Amino acid sequence: MFRRNIITSAILLMAPLAFSAQSLAESLTVEQRLELLEKALRETQSELKKYKDEEKKKYTPATVNRSVSTNDQGYAANPFPTSRAAKPDAVLVKNEEKNASETGSIYSSMTLKDFSKFVKDEIGFSYNGYYRSGWGTASHGSPKSWAIGSLGRFGNEYSGWFDLQLKQRVYNENGKRVDAIVMMDGNVGQQYSTGWFGDNAGGENFMQFSDMYVTTKGFLPFAPEADFWVGKHGAPKIEIQMLDWKTQRTDAAAGVGLENWKVGPGKIDIALVREDVDDYDRSLQNKQQINTNTIDLRYKDIPLWDKATLMVSGRYVSANESASEKDNQDNNGYYDWKETWMFGTSLTQKFDKGGFNEFSFLVANNSIASNFGRYAGASPFTTFNGRYYGDHTGGTAVRLTSQGEAYIGDHFIVANAIVYSFGNDIYSYETGAHSDFESIRAVVRPAYIWDQYNQTGVELGYFTQQNKDANSNKYNESGYKTTLFHTFKVNTSMLTSRPEIRFYATYIKALENELDGFTFEDNKDDQFAVGAQAEIWW
């Protein structure tokens, strides 16, 4: 054995002078290779034991005397009952540095949370999303949603909307970063068991790529901290969450923009995007594509006082029409395109005990003003369900909104969404050109907080709207909703914490329906529904 070791040592010492590393590996016998591996393993185990002993000395609590208790039969009770294995607080990570630390250890400790974050940052990939899904039944057959944008969402939505975002960092060096982002959104039907996209008579199942763009940091010398993006992407959306529509929304086929550009006390978001529309003729049977471009400019996060910020926004939409498109509008009965704009301001106040409230003021003209006049959903689109039509004559509309939530004591929370709007000489999709309208919608949601994971409450919604057409005929639409609910939650906030599972019972009634003629099943003007819904984002 001694002779074999001497020969082996001589071979190992002389090999670098005569052979490459590959040649050495090929010349060693299986026995020699195993001996080298065993030696390396012993050294590693010794180093690991040394580190564990050091950590044990640091964190092992002093021993205490325990009296041995006995059970009812007189036997000694187990002083160390078996328990489920706990998740370790830390993991061992081998240091990259060649020189060991002062203790001589080549390992260091890292918490699982930090280790998980490190791995995610190293990979540079994230998967984010949102969806809702649930079951419901009603007193008159299939449950129906009505006026979600005015009466509120709880117990009044039966869709399966989803958003799925994939983000991959592709470069992050020398103060410059590049990310690729793709987002898909759509709806999965909640009525039939089959969910094939595009193969459903009700049109429930659909999906689109709403975003596909590249965003960067550090490439613009004048705004190194800003997010500069190019591709299919729009300006950030701002939502009235309880009503499920947006106060700020600029959809895009493709564009270029800058977000979070630090200028003065606030930040600038600016986007130039393309958003073509289908321009219809007066029969609403024929259409032509019109190229439109939108500029969306916002100056946000302007500090006012403690926990209060201001945003000022503006949006302008213009068409780039061809000669043939203009000729169709002049001679073939197609609706004329009219430039449209929207501008306004919003103030956000955060509260010391948690919660917030956001107040906004917006004014718009032409087709955006027409969408201010919609009671069901009032996002500032330039079209109605993707179709551009109507005799727009420069009329304007104004909208005032309030939304937020506030804690009252330790066990109560109240969320609200209140909207007042009116317009003059607008095109209404219900009452035509030269219409005036006025509406108010209010939803409040008080709840009792049992603990971090349970709330019981009620959502109360009411709205009323009156339109007056060009002949001064008046049309009224109004209704109310009452929803009792209990929710399983992970935090106490109503508007900013998900996942959430809610159980509800809803009574909803249409008081007047002169704008849309809506009825529930069996031509009823009311509906009682019960159900359960899950909503999650991550």
Swiss-Prot record:
One of its GO terms (biological process) is monoatomic ion transport. The keyword Membrane applies. Keywords: Cell outer membrane, Ion transport, Membrane, Porin, Signal, Transmembrane, Transmembrane beta strand, Transport. It is found in: Cell outer membrane. GO terms for molecular function: carbohydrate transmembrane transporter activity; porin activity. SUPFAM superfamilies: Porins (SSF56935). It holds the Pfam family Sugarporin_N. Its main location: membrane. The keyword Signal applies. Residues 1-25 form the signal peptide. It is a multi-pass membrane protein. CDD domains: Maltoporin-like. One of its GO terms (cellular component) is cell outer membrane. May be a sugar porin with a broad carbohydrate specificity. Belongs to the porin LamB (TC 1.B.3) family. This is Putative outer membrane porin BglH. It comes from Escherichia coli O6:H1 (strain CFT073 / ATCC 700928 / UPEC). The lineage of its organism: Bacteria, Pseudomonadati, Pseudomonadota, Gammaproteobacteria, Enterobacterales. The gene is bglH.
